[in-house]
Every structure is written in C-alpha cells, then in structure tokens.
C-alpha cells in the first residue's frame, strides 16, 4: 500500500541523517520494500553552496546521489523486515547528471528497489526538476 510521509519529524524517525546531511524534505509516496518518491527543496542557504561554486551555485552531483539514496532508504526502512538496519552505499552504477540543480529548484526523486538478497541490495533512481531528468543511477547498498 502506498502512503505519503509529509512530516519532517516522521522522516527523521525513519532516517538516521541529520543537518546538514538530511537531504529529504518530504516523501510523497512510499511502498515499503518496493519504492519511494521524495522531494529535496534546494535553497541558497545550503551549506555546500559556500564553496560549490561561489558566484555560480550548483548542487554537487554526489549530494544528488546521496539525496536519491536517502529516498531509497525510506523505502527500505519502512519495510518491517529491515527496521533498525543502516543502509550504506556499496556502489554506484551508470550515474548520469543531465542538468545542473540550482537554488530554487525542487528535485523529485523516484527510487525503485530492484532486489535485496541477504545484506546486499540494488535500486534504480532518478531525479527530476520540473519534470526534466537531472540525475539517474543504479545504487548498490549494504544493510548493516
């Protein structure tokens, strides 16, 4: 069953990340153990914009991947089979950055869990701004 998680407090009860590394503002849809759709609202107040890049702020690609992974982690951690686990990056395949993400953008991430076997898993994700693809990748993860 699909549900939304609109309260940041509820997201913080699911994910272990905290400022400045909590990169999910809202979950629009989650099907535990299958998929999640979440939002990152990008503002000029993000700490990474101080150095990336002064005078031309662009959200770092690695943080787009991290935000995507956090949305995927919601799909994992809302499945009672994985409650209390810690999903961690094990690899990234096929990462592509299609357009820069700028202050004022709202990135909508969609992540589908492809498989989980034992403590390892694979997911496919994408991020869009105004319906345009900005990032996509396959994420390999380990559950600790």
Swiss-Prot record:
It catalyses: a (3R)-hydroxyacyl-[ACP] = a (2E)-enoyl-[ACP] + H2O. Its main location: cytoplasm. GO terms for biological process: fatty acid biosynthetic process; lipid A biosynthetic process. One of its GO terms (cellular component) is membrane. GO terms for molecular function: (3R)-hydroxyacyl-[acyl-carrier-protein] dehydratase activity. Keywords: Cytoplasm, Lipid A biosynthesis, Lipid biosynthesis, Lipid metabolism, Lyase. It is found in: Cytoplasm. It comes from the Bacteria. InterPro entries: FabA_FabZ, FabZ, HotDog_dom_sf. The active site is at residue 52. It is an enzyme of class 4 (lyase). CDD domains: FabZ. Signal peptide: none annotated. Coiled coil: none annotated. Its EC number is 4.2.1.59. Belongs to the thioester dehydratase family. FabZ subfamily. Involved in unsaturated fatty acids biosynthesis. Catalyzes the dehydration of short chain beta-hydroxyacyl-ACPs and long chain saturated and unsaturated beta-hydroxyacyl-ACPs. PANTHER family: 3-HYDROXYACYL-[ACYL-CARRIER-PROTEIN] DEHYDRATASE. This is 3-hydroxyacyl-[acyl-carrier-protein] dehydratase FabZ. It comes from Carboxydothermus hydrogenoformans (strain ATCC BAA-161 / DSM 6008 / Z-2901).
């Amino acid at each position: 069953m699909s549900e939304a998680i609109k309260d940041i407090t509820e997201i913080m009860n699911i994910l272990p990340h905290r400022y400045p590394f909590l990169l999910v503002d809202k979950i629009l849809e989650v099907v535990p153990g299958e998929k999640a759709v979440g939002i990152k609202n990008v503002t000029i107040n993000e700490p990474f914009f101080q150095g990336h890049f002064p005078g031309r702020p662009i959200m770092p690609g690695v943080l787009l991947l991290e935000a995507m992974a956090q949305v995927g982690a919601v799909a994992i951690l809302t499945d009672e089979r994985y409650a209390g686990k810690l999903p961690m990056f094990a690899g990234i395949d096929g990462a592509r950055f299609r357009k820069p993400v700028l202050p004022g953008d709202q990135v909508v991430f969609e992540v589908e869990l492809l498989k989980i076997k034992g403590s390892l898993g694979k997911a496919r994700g994408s991020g869009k701004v105004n319906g345009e693809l900005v990032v996509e990748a396959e994420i390999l993860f380990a559950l600790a």
